[in-house]
């Protein structure tokens, strides 16, 4: 295939998927700059392998690459800092409920990286559990367990916050 066609296909993919990938990276990392860097790294990996992956649906593969990069970055950061990540301060949902978005971000920050990824892919990206298992390269039952455990951790924090806000 000619380079122009390849580049044109990738540009279309980039326009459609880059904003979604950056939002996912932001939710996973809590840091806008790190999210942008990791998104670009994921897109570079996608571009270099574009001839190999473009015939399949590249979107799930891009999410998998991004999640793996976020996990690696998180591990490196934890080795360096030895402290918990801070919740994102600029996450606002569509209705502009800043406080609620910050509460959710703070609650998500107590989850492990993999649990956070499973929750975000399930509820933020509206993916099915089999799709999540494929993206994260984990057995389906493990993804189900990760989701259940994550929700068990989140439920008390978010239910208490809902009661406090009333």
Which positions does each model-derived feature cover?
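A short, charge-rich alpha-helical start-of-domain segment used by transcription regulators
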Residues: 1-23, 33
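A short pre-motif secondary-structure segment
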Residues: 118-122
